[in-house]
From Swiss-Prot:
Its main location: cytoplasm. L-aspartate binds at T120, N124, D125. Pfam families: Arginosuc_syn_C, Arginosuc_synth. SUPFAM superfamilies: Adenine nucleotide alpha hydrolases-like, Argininosuccinate synthetase, C-terminal domain. The gene is argG. L-citrulline binds at Y88, S93, N124, R128, S177, S186, E263, Y275. PANTHER family: ARGININOSUCCINATE SYNTHASE. It catalyses: L-citrulline + L-aspartate + ATP = 2-(N(omega)-L-arginino)succinate + AMP + diphosphate + H(+). Keywords: Amino-acid biosynthesis, Arginine biosynthesis, ATP-binding, Cytoplasm, Ligase, Nucleotide-binding. This is Argininosuccinate synthase. Homotetramer. It comes from Clostridium perfringens (strain ATCC 13124 / DSM 756 / JCM 1290 / NCIMB 6125 / NCTC 8237 / Type A). One of its GO terms (molecular function) is ATP binding. InterPro entries: Arginosuc_syn_C, Arginosuc_syn_N, Arginosuc_synth, Arginosuc_synth_CS, Arginosuc_synth_type_1_subfam, AS_cat/multimer_dom_body, Rossmann-like_a/b/a_fold.
Length: 403
């Protein structure tokens, strides 16, 4: 096995990366520097420095990436309206590129000769991390233990941790695979691996109440947007991080943003996960409804196509690509008039539009009213229908002729 002098480890303090530190030292004889990308995982950061050093890391970087994460990754994805396979709000997907970018920067700073990640060989994250690493340093060596070591399951990981006195906070019975950041919390594994099983929401959920425990009374909120970016909550201007934190609290209280999904992974198989995205779900709904008011028909319809491709690119780890940047440029243009306020009613998992306004609204009461007006001459509709139906008429006459 090739030896390295210094390895940068993408560290979370979870099971995978906790046991990787002693494994790297044992198998590569290298110095291990742990790097934590703080993308809003909050309480998970507590005690990480002590844990990493105790486990064998020579030092640890805890990099605050939350502001950049929200402004440069989350907000552009909301503007795009991107959902993978119509449901997944890409919480893990767009968190990986920003972390990988920082790993490369610290590797250069430290003079490291390899970067290591703890992603499974069956998952999407290995692709997301390595695409970004190769983008910023094509020559960087990458170590992916899950593709080389003898450990084949999370149960074996737990046993390795026990054998090597690595402190962990999970047991065989609570061994859900989780990923948490400011945007979402995902849950995979155990009983969720069997689609016939109903998720044990009362045991799984951390950000959100179950619908049974959500308040019995609705709550109204008002969101303000400027060029497709949420900038205020209930009339108060907030920075992106604070706004999302507040929406997570409010949405979580009402059981909003919980999805149970079977998705098609990039690497070929299907997987099932439960995702909690309370604040994000509110922002997506608000933004989409405001677009309905502000975008013209052709732009709106074409943007739906762009949104699908944008979601695929993000899901597949292709954030730092010319196509994603080009699509973002198009999306940015569409957002120039997506400004206004929207009132939402939140109730037991539901997000209900309760009214919206915009200085760029394309909705005209004068044209849309069912009452009498002096603008729209309904007689004009007959000529329009005759022209619009011409292809159908020609097709029908041809069919009659053949018969």
């Amino acid at each position: 096995m090739k030896k390295f002098n210094k390895v940068i480890l993408a560290y979370s303090g979870g099971l995978d990366t906790s046991i990787i530190i002693p494994w790297l030292k044992e198998n590569y004889g290298c110095e291990v520097i742990a790097v934590v990308g703080n993308v809003g995982q909050s309480d998970e950061l507590v005690g990480l420095k002590e844990k990493a050093i105790k486990t064998g890391a020579s030092k640890i970087y805890i990099e605050d990436l939350t502001k950049e994460f929200v402004e440069d990754y989350i907000f552009p994805t909301i503007q795009a309206g991107a959902k993978y396979e119509g449901k997944y709000l890409l919480g893990t997907s767009f968190a990986r590129p920003i972390i990988a970018k920082r790993l490369v920067e610290i590797a250069k700073l430290e003079g490291a000769d390899a970067i290591c990640h703890g992603c499974t060989g069956k998952g999407n994250d290995q692709v997301r991390f390595e695409l970004a690493i190769k983008t910023f340093n094509p020559e960087m060596q990458i170590i992916a233990p899950w593709r080389t070591w003898e450990i084949k399951s999370r149960e074996e990981e737990i046993q390795y941790a026990i054998d090597n006195e690595v402190p962990i906070n999970i047991t065989y019975e609570t061994n859900y695979s989780k990923d948490k950041n400011l945007w979402h919390l995902s849950h995979e594994g155990l009983d969720l691996e069997f689609p016939e099983n109903e998720p044990k929401y009362d045991k799984i959920l951390e950000l959100c109440n179950t619908l049974e425990k959500a308040p019995n009374e609705a709550e109204y909120i008002t969101l303000g947007f400027e060029k497709g970016i949420a900038t205020s909550l209930n009339g108060e201007k907030l920075d992106g991080v604070t706004l999302l934190q507040e929406l997570n609290k409010i949405g979580g209280k009402h059981g909003i943003g919980v999805i149970d999904m079977v998705e098609n992974r990039l690497v070929g198989m299907k997987s099932r996960g439960v995702y909690e995205t309370p604040g994000g779900s509110i922002l997506y709904k608000a933004h989409k409804d405001l677009e309905e008011l502000c975008l013209d028909k052709e732009t709106s319809h074409y943007k739906e196509i762009v949104s699908l491709k944008f979601a695929d690119l993000v899901y597949n780890g292709q954030w730092f690509t010319p196509l994603r940047e080009a699509l973002s440029a198009f999306i940015s243009k569409t957002q120039e008039t997506v400004t206004g306020e929207i009132k939402l009613k939140l109730y037991k998992g539901n997000i209900i539009n309760a009214g919206m306004t915009s200085p760029y609204s394309l909705y005209s009461e004068e044209y849309a009213t069912f009452g009498e007006d002096g603008i729209y001459d309904q007689k004009d509709a007959e000529g329009f229908i005759n022209l619009f139906s011409l292809p159908s008429i020609v097709q029908a006459k041809m069919a009659q002729k053949l018969n």
